[in-house]
Structure formats: structure tokens, C-alpha cells
Amino acid sequence: MGEAPISISSSPSKRGFIELCVRRTGHFTEVLHKMQCGDIVGLRGPFGRGFPFEDMKGHDILLVAGGLGIAPLRSLINNIHDERSEFGKVTIIYGSKNPSEVMFRQQFEMWRHRKDFDLYLTVDHPDDTWDGEVGLVTKPFEHLEIDAANTFGA
């Protein structure tokens, strides 16, 4: 079938399944999208270093992503959510080209309503329904106060 590097987007604290975020870009990813629950797929890895989750405990967290870059951070966000009392201030900044390309929209809405997560969504090209910030993913930094000495960033 093929192979491609794909990020796990589910929390490692959830057992018995994993969630992957895969954009359709060619034959291999098209085949993945057509798979049904219960189909078998081979996996290799994990590759990379992961996040220093245990070292992050007790600190503020700043997570910044654009587009598909939110997929691996979603895993970290969900893990932080599962152990929320272990962390200080949590700030999430996510940017997308336009509102229709905002990934995990329902989950962002849930995070937005939490009082213990600061969430900033921004798009480059808003439509009439957009009520978030407009501009590059760096736009929210104009008004954020970050304690650099006590903050882990990803």
C-alpha cells in the first residue's frame, strides 16, 4: 500500500486505540481514508523524540501551531487536559488559512469554553461567520504576557 510519516493525535493516556490525522494527498493517503473500522494496517515507530511531558509538569505551557501542525500538538493538549492539575497556565495558539480549514473544530470549541485553557484561533482569510482573530498565527503574541522562565513551548 505504501508508507508516510503520520502524527498520532490522540492522548497517550487513552488506551486501546490511537487517532491519526491524515490529509489526502496521494494514493497511499487515499487508501487510508477508505479503510473501515477493523481493517488492519501496519505501523512502525514511534520516531522522533516526543514531548518532555514529565519535565513540563509544574510549568506554564505555550503551544503554537498552524494548519496540520496541530495534529501532534492535539495529542499533547489532550494529555495535558487529562492531567490538568499538574500544569500552570496553558495557552494554545492555532492558525489556519480560513475557517473551513480549522482542524478539530469541535474540540477547539470545547477548549475555548474551559476557564483553565487560554485559546487563540486565527485565520488569514476570514468569512462572515468568523469571530476569532484575523492574521498570521503570530498575531496573538501582540497582547500575550508570557513568563519565559516558567514556560515550556511547543
Identify the function of each model-found stretch.
Residues 70-84:
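Histidine-anchored nucleotide/phosphate-binding helix
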Residues 93, 97-154:
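Reductase modules of NAD(P)H-dependent flavoproteins
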Residues 55-60, 64, 74-78:
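Acidic/glycine-rich phosphate/pyrophosphate-binding loops and surrounding catalytic core
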Residues 40-45:
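A short, hydrophobic beta-strand micro-motif
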Residues 66-67, 154:
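A short acidic Gly-Thr/Ser loop motif
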Residues 46-57:
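A short, basic/flexible loop-to-alpha-helix module at the beginning of a structural domain
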Residues 1-39, 96-98, 124-126:
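Ferredoxin-reductase
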